[in-house]
């Protein structure tokens, strides 16, 4: 069993130096509706499209999504795709992008046409320059990488064979890292593993492993033998073969072979899942995980990634929910830690077409009246967010001596209720700004308010939402409970 809380708490203190091939991933979703009258070719009725940072850039984004810092070195052309990638990466808080410009190179761009209903890929169009970086660009890459090695806890090379990781760049990075005692993970593309000589860990997939060995490995014994032959060539400490639905197998230089089965999930899209695996491995190993813990963490992350569409990242919260059994998930999982955390929940729920409800209050001493309103609110929606006044806000509204319980305690009590899906603490006297951010489908308050008195009702109804008043339970109020307790 992984001590995931202990491991993940160390993620934010790690820095990963990631070097590799950057690309722009575009997804065009739609359905084939007819055959073109111009030629015997299908016509795709486009419904939506999205753009993501791909290749080694997706590795960097997955590192950052786990809370670690990433120094990313890559290559981009002086074109529209390159400009879009630079802009996107510059806005990533935990990524420091060091992108070398190459005017002679087209930025790698992949456009995938995907069935919206079936999630199957129908066609892919690529724009790319496969030639290795020129000598001048090679030197610029090396000059950008070497000064960053002392800052890194671990180094990750993400090779997509698009020109960045030339033999000279690879050797400069691995040799430099070894002189400083830094571990190096390589996600290889070349069938010649000798060019990665001296790396700590190589992570080929099944096809890359077969290409490098020249033979199939149909069982664990033959895989381990072939892996050790490769390890002698690469002079690496371990080799990990990722095998899609068959899981992943690590062959260490010393010790037993470790096999981790794949999680049983409905696969939506495998694009970028390998990026998620190597990113999670790098962060986990940097944080002190042993081989098995790192593998199990990476396998859990891959299961989250393949259940998403497009080039996906996996957040620390998503990973935690997949690793820990539901019974062990603390109420804190239902407390929004930041505006960004709130937005992630909202995005996920809206993608699923869920009806979002909102109610708010101080909830200083939870009583049956509160429970009635919360239960009624949850019955009117698919996901209920409770806005909770902060300690400072309660004090301004209720006076000295309040709140009785601090905001953290109040949030944990609310989060423990089955009716509550998320608690969001706000500092203002009213939740108007929070309602504007959430844009709920349903706004709920106790029936001691009139419709006109409900804060935010104009915002909700203007968007076609609904405002619901729930009859209060007479004889219960926090103020009266406090007075009665004080006189006892």
Curated annotation (Swiss-Prot):
Residues the record marks as active site: 275
Keyword Iron-sulfur: no
Annotated binding of ATP, by residue: 205-208
Residue span of region Ribokinase: 1-330
A GO BP annotation: ADP-L-glycero-beta-D-manno-heptose biosynthetic process
Pathway: Nucleotide-sugar biosynthesis; ADP-L-glycero-beta-D-manno-heptose biosynthesis; ADP-L-glycero-beta-D-manno-heptose from D-glycero-beta-D-manno-heptose 7-phosphate: step 1/4; Nucleotide-sugar biosynthesis; ADP-L-glycero-beta-D-manno-heptose biosynthesis; ADP-L-glycero-beta-D-manno-heptose from D-glycero-beta-D-manno-heptose 7-phosphate: step 3/4
Catalyses which reaction(s): D-glycero-beta-D-manno-heptose 7-phosphate + ATP = D-glycero-beta-D-manno-heptose 1,7-bisphosphate + ADP + H(+); D-glycero-beta-D-manno-heptose 1-phosphate + ATP + H(+) = ADP-D-glycero-beta-D-manno-heptose + diphosphate
Pfam families in alphabetical order: CTP_transf_like (PF01467), PfkB (PF00294)
A Gene Ontology molecular function term of the record: phosphotransferase activity, alcohol group as acceptor
Keywords noted in UniProt: ATP-binding, Carbohydrate metabolism, Kinase, Multifunctional enzyme, Nucleotide-binding, Nucleotidyltransferase, Transferase
Superkingdom per UniProt: Bacteria
UniProt entry tagged with the keyword Acyltransferase: no
Classification via PANTHER family: BIFUNCTIONAL PROTEIN HLDE (PTHR46969:SF1)
NCBIfam families cross-referenced by the UniProt entry: cyt_tran_rel, rfaE_dom_I, rfaE_dom_II
Subunit structure: Homodimer.
Protein name stated in the entry: Bifunctional protein HldE
Gene for this chain: hldE
């Amino acid at each position: 069993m992984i001590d995931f809380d202990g491991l993940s708490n160390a993620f934010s203190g790690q820095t990963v130096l990631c070097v590799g091939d950057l690309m722009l991933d575009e997804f065009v979703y739609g359905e084939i509706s007819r055959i073109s009258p111009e030629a015997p070719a299908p016509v795709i009725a486009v419904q939506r499209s999205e753009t993501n940072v791909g290749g080694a850039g997706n590795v960097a984004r997955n590192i950052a999504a786990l809370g670690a810092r990433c120094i990313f070195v890559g290559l981009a052309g002086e074109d529209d795709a390159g400009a879009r990638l630079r802009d996107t990466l510059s806005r990533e808080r935990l990524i420091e992008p060091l992108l070398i410009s190459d005017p002679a190179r087209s930025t790698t761009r992949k456009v995938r046409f995907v069935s919206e209903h079936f999630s199957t890929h129908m066609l892919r169009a690529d724009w790319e320059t496969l030639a290795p970086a020129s000598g001048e660009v090679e030197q610029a890459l090396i000059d950008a990488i070497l000064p960053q090695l002392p800052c890194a806890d671990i180094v990750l090379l993400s090779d997509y064979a698009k020109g960045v990781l030339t033999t000279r760049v690879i050797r400069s990075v691995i040799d430099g890292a070894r002189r400083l005692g830094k571990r190096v993970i390589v996600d290889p593309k070349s069938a010649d593993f000798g060019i990665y000589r001296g790396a700590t860990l190589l992570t080929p997939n099944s096809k890359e492993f077969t290409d490098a060995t020249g033979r199939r490995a149909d069982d664990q014994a033959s895989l381990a033998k072939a892996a050790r032959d490769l390890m002698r060539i690469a002079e690496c400490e371990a080799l990990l073969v990722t095998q899609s639905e068959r899981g992943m197998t690590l062959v260490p230089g010393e010790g037993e072979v470790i096999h981790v089965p794949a999680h049983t999930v409905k696969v939506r899209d495998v694009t970028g899942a390998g990026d998620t695996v190597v990113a999670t491995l790098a962060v986990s190993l940097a944080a002190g995980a042993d081989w098995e813990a790192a593998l199990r963490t990476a396998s859990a992350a891959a299961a989250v990634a393949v259940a998403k569409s497009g080039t996906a990242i996996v957040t620390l919260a998503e990973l935690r929910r997949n690793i820990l059994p539901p019974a062990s998930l603390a109420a804190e999982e239902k407390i929004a830690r930041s505006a960004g955390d709130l937005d992630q929940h909202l995005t996920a729920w809206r993608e699923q077409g869920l009806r979002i409800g909102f109610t708010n209050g101080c909830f200083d001493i939870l009583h049956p009246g509160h429970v009635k309103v919360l239960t009624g609110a949850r019955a009117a929606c698919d996901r209920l967010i409770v806005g909770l006044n902060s300690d400072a806000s309660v004090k301004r509204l209720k006076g000295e001596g309040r709140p009785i319980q601090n905001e953290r305690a109040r949030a944990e009590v609310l989060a423990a209720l089955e009716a509550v899906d998320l608690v969001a603490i706000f500092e203002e006297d009213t939740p108007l700004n929070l309602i504007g951010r959430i844009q709920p489908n349903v706004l709920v308050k106790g029936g001691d308010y009139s419709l006109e008195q409900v804060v935010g009702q104009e915002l909700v109804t203007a968007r076609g939402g609904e405002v619901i008043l729930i009859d209060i339970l007479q004889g219960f109020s926090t103020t009266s409970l406090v007075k009665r307790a004080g006189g006892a």
